[in-house]
Each structure stands twice: as structure tokens, then as C-alpha cells.
């Protein structure tokens, strides 16, 4: 009975999504306040029904209701309860329900926290989000019903959750990623609402920017968590492989980065209006593209769900409808938007435009490398692999250029900057950066161009931010000046610091990582990176739904024991799947990483040993960026509720459409 109630809740949520997407939009066109007022209760009801449906599916998993096909295919009575909970979104149907729930949550949040918006603007925004919900709920109910029953024959037990997903990473990574993916629908909805209203001015940018910052922060942290999960779970010691589905999440993040900067220019200076709308459309369209790649069956990836062609066709049609419809509306409305505001070559507007171009080119390069092999295969049947050499060769120079421009962009002023003043600001920053880069490079011994470059660029970014802070607080004192600066400013500084930290981690871990693949018997030792690894053998271990051989490796340096690592080779009994669990000793400046390979004769094992310096800085930098975005979204000016002022800015007071 509970699964049937969940299915009914999905149908009712779809009905409310249809109401939300149509009547408020018609009301905005006709100037009918009663019809526009339906947007909020429809959004609330839709979210409530989606939450109820999600609760019903969770109940089915926790109660081992194997009469539900989705539960039988992705759970087992021996599965720990916390993995049963995360299994709710561990495969196609449940992950799509989570997507719909999060979209309903974003819609609910917009309806609650945007009361200061003019009613006509809010009605359009919620209507657009209702259209997106309608598409996903139709897809969910028609092709991917998570409540389908296996009747009259119900299995005694389930097939178990994919062993690769029986990890804490599944609990946190997909929800964070989906919060970012779906969050870009808010910026998309604001952009479409502005196009429908025919007014692309600073007001829509001001109100969509905090939502975009939060979505960008969630997506960035989700990507970081996915990288961390792959690093420790897959046993190969890497943190990024340019997998097509990794790329599918990275592309909207890059375009979203361009969007939050372009929104700032539109909000403060009233320029880049059409370009900002186009970025909002692109960011959400790339999120939908990621959904298509994961669920269409066109990819073979650890991230991809097995799927039938009907699902792929449905998502592709929805993607084309969203992209085609929004671009058509953009083509009709955007040409009439003109900006009378000018700016000089050396201005913040110019540097932010350069920022946007670099980020969009980077995303386009990744899009080309991701889709070209798929298109070639579809059109000619030829197989082509585009791997890390292509992406690294194209992406890294662009990021170096971005970091070089970033420091200048922080220091230049809006509209125009005297060149003599700018030179006086940049010269000491460049000199100090060169000194720090040389010192950092010498600390690591042998000269390395990549290391020198990353230290120079990172110091350039950090010191430019510090120089800007000193300039802004010079008349108030450091402490008083720091308190007077906005959260948006501190969020920017934190995010830029995260870029520098992440860049250092990427280069140092790639340049100085050491690895050995070898055969080790009990008592064997190996020296690597100044560390001494002693293999004590492996012992049999029984888990809740698996058996394993757990190794014991003692690590010492200069005669002092540092850690004992316990890598495992697990056999999950239900699916007879063998999995590798790495043994890791994490440190601020290095990771010691050991993975077991295959068992050999006489108690010996194939063992892979890594010493990975500064690898944690990659994820620490990513977290700093995400926290910076979240802090900027909490800026006081985004919470000021002055409804009349907003109406006047939008030019919508007293208008019906």
C-alpha cells in the first residue's frame, strides 16, 4: 500500500506542476493577480507530495519490501541500514526522484525567500520552474517509475546495491551534486522570466545572483566530494580522469563561474545583459546534458546508469525543447536590449569579460572532447578515445591565463583605472610573487618549470587579494576596515584563495607523486619517497555482507613508525563482486596510499604503493571555493527587503505583464 501511495503522490505532484507552470504565467500575461497567486501554493504542494513520495520509497528500502522492483534490484536484507537509505538514489529511478525532490525544494525556497519580488516576476519565475518539474515528473512517471511492483512473484531477497556504491560517498556526493545541477534552474528561470517581461536590467541579476552562488557552491563541493570518493574507493590513486560524466558536471560549473561574475557586472554596471542571460541558459542546459549522458545509455562509465533507448530519447527531446525554446526566446528578445554604459580597456568590466571568455572557451573545449567521440561513433561507427593528454594540453594553459588575469581583475576599478596607479599597485605584487615562487621552487630541490609557474601564479593571486584588502582598509585600520567589508567581498577572497590552493595541490601532487607496483610477501619492505613500508601479510575478515582479506602495512620514517595501513580486497557475496579498499594515511602535506592487487602464491600479494604530496590541497582548495560562494550569497544586500524599490527598478509597478 505504501508504494501505491508514493506513486499517487508523484501523480498529484505532476498535476500541481502543470498548474504552477500554466496558470501563473497566463495570470502574468493578463494581469490577473488571483491566477498569479496560485504559483506559491502550487509550489508548496508539489514539494510536499514529492517529499512524501521520497519518504515512501525510503520506507520500502528500510523495510526490505522486495515486492518493489527498484528495491529488489538495489538492496538486500544484509545491507547496513545507512546503505539502504543511500540506495534510494543509488540507481536510475531513485536518483531521478531525488532530482525531482531537490527541484521541488529549490522551487519551494524561491517561493518562500523571494516575497520581496514583484508578484508578476515571481509568478513567471515559478512558472518556468514548474515547466521544468513537469518535464522531469513526466519522465519519472512514464519511463522510470520507482514504485513498480514485482507481483505476484516476490523475490525472497534483493540483488544488493552495487558494491562500488556501498560507501559514505554515495550518501553525500549525489545530493550535493544534484543541489548544484538543479540549482542552476533558478538562474535559468530568472533569465527566462526577465526575457518574458522584456526587461533585462540590473534587478533580475541582483535577485538571481545569490541563488546562482549557492548552486555554484553546491556543485563545486559535489565535484570535490566525487573526486575524493574516486581517489580512495577505486584503488588507482588518481583524483580526476576526465571521465565523460566527470566532464558533464565540470562544464556547468565552469559556465556557472562565468555566470556569477557576469551577474556582478550586470548588477553593478548594467552591461553584459544579453550575455548574462545566455550564460544562465547555457549553465542549466549543460546540467541537462549531464543528465542525458548519464541516463541515455550512450556512455560506458562508472557513473552511468544502464538505461533503455526510450529513456534516452525522452531526455534528449526534453533537452532540445528546453535549449531550443529558451534560445528562440533569447533571439526574439535580446536584440532589443541595448547598453548605454561604456568602460575603458583597463577596467574591471574588461577583466571580467576576459574571465568569461576564458571560462567559456574552457567549457567548450571540454564539451568538444566529450561529445566528439560519441558523435563519431554514432555517425560512422568509428571508435575514438579522447583522454587526459588532450584535456590537460588544452585546459591547463587556459587556467594559467585565468589566474594571471584574476589578480589584475581584483585590483582594477569599475569603468576606468589610471594606468600609472594600476602599475604602482601591481609592481610590488609581482616582485613579491617572484621572490616567493623562487623560494618555493628551490625548497623542492630540482628546478621544475611547472612548479615555478604554479607558485608564481598562486602567489600572484593571493598577494593581489591582500594588496586590495590593504587598499580598502588603509583609512580605517586593519580591524575596523575588515569589519566594514561585505560578506560578498570576503567570499570572493576566500574563493580566489581556494583557486591558488587547488592549483598548488594539482601541480605538486602530479609532479612529485611516487608509485611502485610490486610483489610483497609477509616481512617484505620497500622504500618510497623517504618512507619505509613493511608488509605484515593479510588476514581474513568477515563484514556484514562481504568477506575480505585485510592487509597490514607498517609505515615508518627515520626509524619512527608513522602509521599502520589496512588495505582490503573485498568479495561482496550477493553479486560475487571483488572490490579494492585502499589503506590511506592522510596528512596536510602528503598522503600515504596502499592498495592490494591480486593474491599470489605463498601468502604474497600484488601491492601498489603511493606517496602523494599535497594531494589534499586539491580538495581543500575546492572546499574554500565552495565556502566562498556560500559566504558571498549571505551578503546583506541580498537580504534587504525593499519591495517598492525593486518594483521601480524593474519598471513593473502597476503593470500586469
Curated annotation (Swiss-Prot):
Topology of the protein relative to the lipid bilayer: Multi-pass membrane protein
Keyword match Cell inner membrane: yes
Assigned GO CC terms: plasma membrane
Transmembrane segments: 8-28, 42-62, 94-114, 122-142, 176-196, 211-231, 245-265, 274-294, 312-332, 356-376, 391-411, 421-441, 444-464, 488-508, 614-634
UniProt KW keywords: Cell inner membrane, Cell membrane, Cytochrome c-type biogenesis, Membrane, Transmembrane, Transmembrane helix
InterPro entries: CcmF_C (IPR032523), Cyt_c_assembly (IPR002541), Cyt_c_biogenesis (IPR003567), Cyt_c_biogenesis_CcmF (IPR003568)
Pfam families (UniProt xref): CcmF_C, Cytochrom_C_asm
Subcellular compartments: Cell inner membrane
GO biological process: bacterial-type flagellum-dependent swarming motility; bacterial-type flagellum-dependent swimming motility; cytochrome complex assembly; pyoverdine biosynthetic process; type IV pilus-dependent motility
Source domain of life: Bacteria
Any one GO molecular-function label of the UniProt entry: heme binding
Tagged with keyword Nucleus: no
Family, per entry: Belongs to the CcmF/CycK/Ccl1/NrfE/CcsA family.
PANTHER family the record matches: CYTOCHROME C ASSEMBLY PROTEIN-RELATED, CYTOCHROME C-TYPE BIOGENESIS PROTEIN CCMF
Function: Required for the biogenesis of c-type cytochromes. Possible subunit of a heme lyase.
Name of the protein in its database record: Cytochrome c-type biogenesis protein CcmF
Annotated organism of origin: Pseudomonas aeruginosa (strain ATCC 15692 / DSM 22644 / CIP 104116 / JCM 14847 / LMG 12228 / 1C / PRS 101 / PAO1)
Amino acid at each position: 500500500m505504501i508504494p501505491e501511495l508514493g506513486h499517487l503522490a508523484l501523480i498529484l505532484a505532476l498535476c500541481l506542476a502543470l498548474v504552477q507552470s500554466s496558470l501563473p504565467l497566463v495570470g502574468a500575461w493578463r494581469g490577473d493577480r488571483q491566477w498569479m497567486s496560485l504559483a506559491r501554493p502550487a509550489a508548496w504542494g508539489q514539494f510536499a507530495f514529492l517529499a512524501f513520495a521520497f519518504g515512501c520509497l525510503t520506507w520500502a528500502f528500510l523495510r526490505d519490501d522486495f515486492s518493489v522492483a527498484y528495491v529488489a534490484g538495489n538492496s538486500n536484507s544484509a545491507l547496513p541500514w545507512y546503505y539502504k537509505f543511500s540506495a534510494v538514489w543509488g540507481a536510475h529511478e531513485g536518483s531521478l526522484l531525488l532530482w525531482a525532490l531537490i527541484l521541488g525544494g529549490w522551487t519551494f525556497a524561491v517561493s518562500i525567500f523571494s516575497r520581496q519580488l514583484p508578484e508578476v516576476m515571481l509568478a513567471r519565475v515559478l512558472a518556468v520552474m514548474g515547466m521544468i518539474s513537469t518535464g522531469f515528473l513526466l519522465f519519472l512517471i512514464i519511463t522510470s517509475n520507482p514504485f513498480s511492483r514485482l507481483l505476484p512473484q516476490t523475490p525472497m531477497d534483493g540483488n544488493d546495491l552495487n558494491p562500488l556504491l556501498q560507501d559514505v560517498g554515495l550518501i553525500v556526493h549525489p545530493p550535493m551534486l544534484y543541489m548544484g545541477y538543479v540549482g542552476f534552474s533558478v538562474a535559468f528561470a530568472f533569465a527566462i522570466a526577465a526575457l518574458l517581461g522584456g526587461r533585462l536590467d540590473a534587478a533580475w541579476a541582483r535577485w538571481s545572483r545569490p541563488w546562482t552562488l549557492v548552486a555554484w557552491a553546491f556543485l563545486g563541493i559535489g565535484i570535490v566530494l566525487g573526486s575524493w570518493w574516486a581517489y580512495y574507493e577505486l584503488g588507482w590513486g588518481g583524483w580526476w580522469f576526465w571521465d565523460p560524466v566527470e566532464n558533464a558536471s565540470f562544464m556547468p560549473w565552469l559556465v556557472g563561474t562565468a555566470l556569477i561574475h557576469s551577474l556582478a557586472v550586470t548588477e553593478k554596471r548594467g552591461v553584459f545583459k544579453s550575455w548574462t542571460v545566455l550564460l544562465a541558459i547555457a549553465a542549466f542546459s549543460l546540467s541537462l546534458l549531464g543528465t542525458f549522458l548519464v541516463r541515455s545509455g550512450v556512455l560506458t562509465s562508472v557513473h552511468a546508469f544502464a538505461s533503455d533507448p526510450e529513456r534516452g530519447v525522452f531526455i534528449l527531446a526534453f533537452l532540445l525543447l528546453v535549449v531550443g525554446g529558451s534560445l528562440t526566446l533569447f533571439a526574439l528578445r535580446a536584440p532589443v536590449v541595448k547598453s548605454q554604459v561604456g568602460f575603458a580597456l583597463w577596467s574591471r568590466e574588461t577583466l571580467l569579460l576576459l574571465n568569461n571568455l576564458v571560462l567559456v572557451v574552457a567549457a567548450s573545449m571540454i564539451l568538444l572532447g566529450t561529445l566528439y567521440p560519441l558523435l563519431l561513433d554514432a555517425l560512422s561507427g568509428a571508435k575514438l578515445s579522447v583522454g587526459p593528454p588532450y584535456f590537460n594540453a588544452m585546459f591547463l594553459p587556459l587556467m594559467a591565463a585565468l589566474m594571471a588575469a584574476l589578480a589584475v581583475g581584483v585590483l582594477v576599478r569599475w569603468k576606468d583605472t589610471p594606468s600609472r596607479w594600476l602599475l604602482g599597485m601591481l609592481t610590488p605584487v609581482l616582485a613579491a610573487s617572484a621572490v616567493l615562487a623562487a623560494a618555493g621552487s628551490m625548497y623542492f630541490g630540482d628546478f621544475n618549470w611547472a612548479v615555478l609557474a604554479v607558485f608564481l601564479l598562486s602567489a600572484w593571486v593571493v598577494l593581489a587579494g591582500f594588496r586590495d584588502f590593504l587598499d580598502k582598509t588603509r583609512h580605517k585600520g586593519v580591524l575596523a576596515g575588515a569589519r566594514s567589508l561585505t560578506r560578498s567581498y570576503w567570499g570572493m577572497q576566500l574563493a580566489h584563495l581556494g583557486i591558488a590552493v587547488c592549483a598548488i595541490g594539482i601541480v605538486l601532487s602530479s609532479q612529485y607523486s611516487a608509485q611502485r607496483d610490486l610483489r610483497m610477501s609477509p616481512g617484505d619492505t620497500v622504500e618510497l619517497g623517504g618512507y619505509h613500508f613493511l608488509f605484515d601479510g593479510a588476514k581474513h575478515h568477515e563484514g556484514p555482507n562481504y568477506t575480505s582479506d585485510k592487509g597490514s602495512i607498517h609505515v615508518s620514517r627515520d626509524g619512527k613508525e608513522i602509521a599502520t595501513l589496512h588495505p582490503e580486497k573485498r568479495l561482496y557475496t550477493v553479486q560475487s563482486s571483488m572490490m579494492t579498499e585502499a589503506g590511506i594515511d592522510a596528512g596536510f602535506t602528503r598522503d600515504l596510499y596502499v592498495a592490494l592487487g591480486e593474491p599470489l602464491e605463498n601468502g604474497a600479494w600484488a601491492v601498489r604503493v603511493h606517496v602523494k604530496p599535497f594531494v589534499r590541497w586539491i580538495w581543500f582548495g575546492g572546499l574554500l571555493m565552495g565556502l566562498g560562494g556560500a559566504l558571498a550569497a549571505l551578503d546583506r544586500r541580498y537580504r534587504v527587503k525593499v519591495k517598492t524599490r525593486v518594483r521601480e527598478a524593474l519598471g513593473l509597478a502597476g503593470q500586469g505583464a
